[in-house]
């Protein structure tokens, strides 16, 4: 039977992952069956590559395309990199060290295959139990901006993040793209980065799926 679509695109959190932040057996079964029928599987998420690889390897989808860090990077499940759009090193370092209230906000970065944070925040661990992907606590003033896919700020509430967003917009303007993944998480990427842009670029590069066939996320 010919399926009416050539590809499926899904996020992870709130979509493929269940309430325990794991991928369920039924979801694994459906994705595996679709892949065996020739449907291309795209995962587009704000998570980092090693985190996503561990989750998706449970599915029999050898050629899954993983769009990670909100579109800053795309790799086949095997690890082969197809695209990446890092923040400039100096800009990334400045973002990591922007002023904020450390009692209300923490700063994180995804850099290559690593996750860095300025404090140990145990509440984040539940989201990564399945993959085991874990942060490293660093002093960002002594850190570096190499291979930065995104810098993100987690606040106790939205009001804690609004001054940071305003400062970033006023200082860096169109050099960066900002988005709230949740009301408590402000994410900052290169100005060309979004899931939609990454998927469009992949469609043009790979050619197996026409851009017109893709229903694209907006972040």
Q: What is each stretch, according to the model?
A:
Residues 6-19:
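Asp-based phosphoryl-transfer active-site loop
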Residues 22, 26, 194:
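Residue-level recognition of oxygen-bearing side chains
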Residues 25-124:
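Active-site phosphate-binding/coordination module
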Residues 10, 68, 180-181:
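Conserved strand-loop elements at the edges of beta-sheets that form or border functional pockets
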Residues 215-219:
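A short, hydrophobic C-terminal helix/tail in secreted or cell-surface proteins
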């Amino acid at each position: 039977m010919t399926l009416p679509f050539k590809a499926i695109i899904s996020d992870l959190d709130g979509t493929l992952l269940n309430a325990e932040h794991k991928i369920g057996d039924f979801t694994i079964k459906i994705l595996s069956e679709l892949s065996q029928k020739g449907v291309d599987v795209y995962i587009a998420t704000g998570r980092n590559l090693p985190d996503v690889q561990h989750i998706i390897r449970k599915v029999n989808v050898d050629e899954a395309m993983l769009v990670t860090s909100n579109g800053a990077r795309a790799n086949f499940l095997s690890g082969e990199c197809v695209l990446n759009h890092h923040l400039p090193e100096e800009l990334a370092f400045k973002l990591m060290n922007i002023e904020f209230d450390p009692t209300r906000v923490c700063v994180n970065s995804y850099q290559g295959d690593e996750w860095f944070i300025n404090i140990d925040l145990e509440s984040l661990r539940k989201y990564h139990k399945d993959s085991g992907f874990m942060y490293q606590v660093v002093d960002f003033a002594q850190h570096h901006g190499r291979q930065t896919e995104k810098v993100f700020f987690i606040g106790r509430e939205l009001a804690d993040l609004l001054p940071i967003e305003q400062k970033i917009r006023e200082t860096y303007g169109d050099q960066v793209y900002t988005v709230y993944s949740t009301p408590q998480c402000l994410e900052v990427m290169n100005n060309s980065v979004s899931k939609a842009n990454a998927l469009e670029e992949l469609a043009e590069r790979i050619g197996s799926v026409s851009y017109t066939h893709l229903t694209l996320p907006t972040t």
